[in-house]
Each structure stands twice: as C-alpha cells, then as structure tokens.
Amino acid sequence: MTSAPPNSILAAATPPATVAALITRLHPVACGHELIRVGSAHDGGYLIPDDLGGIAMCFSPGVSTNADFETDLFRRSGIPSALADGSVDGPPPGAVFHSFEKRFLGSSTNRGFMRLEDWVTRHCPDGLPGDLLLQMDIEGSEYAVLIDTPATVLRRFRIMVIEFHSLEWLFSTFGCMLMSAIFDKLLADFVVCHLHPNNYAPTQRRGTLEIPTVMEFTFLRRDRVRPGDPQPMIPHPLDAPCRPDKPELPLPPCWQPVAPAP
C-alpha cells in the first residue's frame, strides 16, 4: 500500500465525502445467483453469476495471450466468444473462439480500432435472440469505450466483467467527475455483484479511503437479480490472486457493504 505524494495530481483532491459516496454505490450486492469461477486459477479467471442459460455470445476485447476464460466458458456452456486485440496477431494457441480481430476497442472505427457498438452489431444484429456477455480488460481504454457505447447496447449484455484501471484517479477532481459519470451510466441498468482487486499494483490511501489501482468488477443486469442472501461473500472462496507469486490484495473495508445489525 502506498500513500499519494503531496505534490502529485492526486493532491488536487476530490472531497473525501464525494469519493466515499461513489464507493458506497459500488459496493457489491448479493444477486441471487451462485458465483462461479470461469477461466484459470489466477490471471484469466473471473467470478461471474451462474446465470448463463440463454446467452448467445461473449465479446472479449483485450484477449492478449490468455483466452482461458473464453475457452472455459465454451466448454462449460457452449457460449462462443468473439475475440479482439490489436497487440497480438492471433488468438492464443489452444483457444476456443468464434472469431478474432486484430483491432483495439476505442471510440471510433478505423483500420486499427473499432467501437464496441459496431463490433456487437456486426456479430449480433438487433433482434437476434439471446443476451450477451462482455469480458473486457483493455488497459485503461475502458473509460473511452464505455462513454462512447450507448446504454441500449450495454443493456444487451446480461453479465459484464470489466477490469478498471487507474482507479486512484477517483481522488482527483477530474478523475472522479469522469469516473462517476461512467459508473452512473452502468449502475442505471446493472448491479455490482463482485469486486476483486488485482494484486499487480498496490492500493492508494487517503485518510480512511483506500482504493485499489486496478480492480475487476462483475456486473449483472438488474432484471436478472433474484432475491437471495442479503450480503455477498467477501472475500469469496473462489477468489485467487491474479499474480500467484504475490500475496492476495484484500478488498479494502470502504468497498465492503456494512452487515446489517442482528
């Protein structure tokens, strides 16, 4: 864990109450579905709700050299995955996939980039039966992509697993304003059902607030939430460090819902 240096960009601080209010809105909730781990035991594995019936396709940008999630997803449920990554020439050896595109996701479609909306529409035109699944780890470009993607397109995804980067920017005025707008957009139609800090990077602390630099968020569309346990399991028994050679990074207390009084 590190503290923000006083002369850094983080010194232009968001009021702590503003950051705390957003973090509270992002607390994971019990979604009424058991969480299962899909993919590898470490990096490339994610916890998602066991609510896969009727999902037609997974979209997985930023696949890099690890398609454990997509391959395991197909073997478990028969859900095919569309892969994309401009940093590699093809999918990893042994990957099970529907298609691969050597492109990055961005806010425009051109030779090296494509919009999420364009990609989804090409493979799954409006009216095609079935929901979709998004597994996105695109090294910070998630913010531009989520701003650009219409809510009508995002609502086509039943489950979204998104790795958010540079979350310490919540401590800065501009960063908090930008991220709040993005999370507000997502929370209108989704709940957070799981959070898992990535132990590749440390946390940043300011007062009682502690923010993991990189964190995996699992979202479930609100219409799929079922009554269930009032509290999510934190940590979850299936959680595992992304880097097995480093200690697990626990979810800081400020990101955890307070258990109701007995």
Question: What do the predicted segments below correspond to?
Answer:
Residues 2-57, 66, 101-102, 112-130, ...:
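Rossmann-like AdoMet/SAM-dependent catalytic core
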Residues 52-53, 73-77, 151-157, 186:
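Short, conserved loop/helix-junction motifs that constitute active-site signature segments
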Residues 64-76:
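Conserved SAM-binding loop of SAM-dependent methyltransferases across substrates and taxa
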Residues 65-66, 83-91:
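Short, polar loop motifs at secondary-structure junctions
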Residues 73-74, 89-98, 152:
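Short loop/helix-cap segments at secondary-structure boundaries that form the rim of catalytic
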Residues 79-80, 95-104:
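Active-site regions of enzymes building and remodeling cell-envelope glycoconjugates
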Residues 103-106, 137:
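Conserved acidic residues
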Residues 134-141:
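Switch II (G3) loop of P-loop NTPases
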